[in-house]
């Protein structure tokens, strides 16, 4: 065997390995929050959805049978600016804004409730399965249903367009709850989890795990009083809260 033949035999396996390898996924970032301040949350709020409106007020969607509501309030003064109560047959869930309108999910009723700016209900739409979290990418509404799947919904008709399976390091991220769309990412609460997950909604890949250990949760001892509620303020700043919490936490993600 010639020298060139021997060299080809040695190099060939390496070449095949190189050709068949796939690029490794980028590593998941591990971030945390810094608490910048607090504000009062309206009392008796089983928080299911939270968003900042164009006037820097907060929209709050709450749950529980017979107690669910949609409310606009000022985080600076704590004043309620508008409020509507859901019919007792609905358990309220996630909310999001689409122009001058607001959509609110219901848990098991398969109904999305549409409101005008003054929180007057103007329409309804139906969907299959449960409703948990909701946010607006600018093109689609992203909806969670407690699984590891994000559902892409039409912002006008609420018809389902497509779905994306969410994974963390290749494994399904189950129990996705409240959602907040920010730029090309979606920030998600996961039920019974003190982390927040930043997700690429096009691929479903979790790009960052954000610890909220800097928030003192020691007073919230009821198992149901979990972290739930993300509202983007600007840049890397957010309002965070939870179910039946008394406070909103103004945080910076870093």
Which residues does each predicted region cover?
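Surface loop/turn motifs at the tips and blade-to-blade linkers of beta-strand repeat domains
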Residues: 38-43, 84-88, 123-129, 164-171, ...
């Amino acid at each position: 065997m010639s020298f060139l033949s021997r060299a080809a035999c040695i190099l060939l396996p390496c070449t095949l390995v190189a050709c068949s390898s796939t690029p490794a996924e980028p590593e998941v970032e591990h971030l945390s929050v810094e608490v910048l301040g607090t504000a009062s949350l309206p009392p008796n709020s089983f928080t299911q959805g939270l968003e900042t409106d164009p006037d820097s007020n907060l929209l709050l969607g709450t749950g529980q049978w017979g107690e669910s509501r949609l409310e606009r309030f000022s985080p600076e003064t704590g004043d309620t600016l508008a409020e509507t109560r859901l019919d007792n047959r609905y358990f309220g869930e996630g909310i999001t804004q689409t122009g001058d309108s607001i959509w609110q999910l219901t848990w098991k009723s398969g109904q999305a409730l549409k409101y005008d700016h003054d929180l007057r209900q103007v329409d309804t739409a139906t969907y299959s399965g449960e409703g948990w979290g909701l946010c607006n990418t600018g093109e689609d509404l992203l909806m969670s249903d407690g699984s590891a799947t994000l559902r892409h919904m039409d912002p006008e008709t609420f018809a389902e367009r497509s779905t994306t399976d969410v994974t963390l390091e290749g494994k399904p991220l189950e129990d996705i709850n409240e959602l907040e769309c920010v730029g090309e990412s979606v920030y998600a609460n996961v039920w019974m989890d003190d982390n927040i997950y930043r997700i690429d909604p096009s691929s479903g890949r979790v790009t960052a795990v954000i610890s909220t250990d800097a928030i003192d949760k020691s007073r919230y001892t009821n198992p149901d009083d979990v972290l739930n509620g993300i509202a983007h303020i600007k840049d890397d700043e957010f309002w965070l809260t939870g179910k039946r919490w008394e406070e909103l936490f103004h945080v910076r993600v870093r």
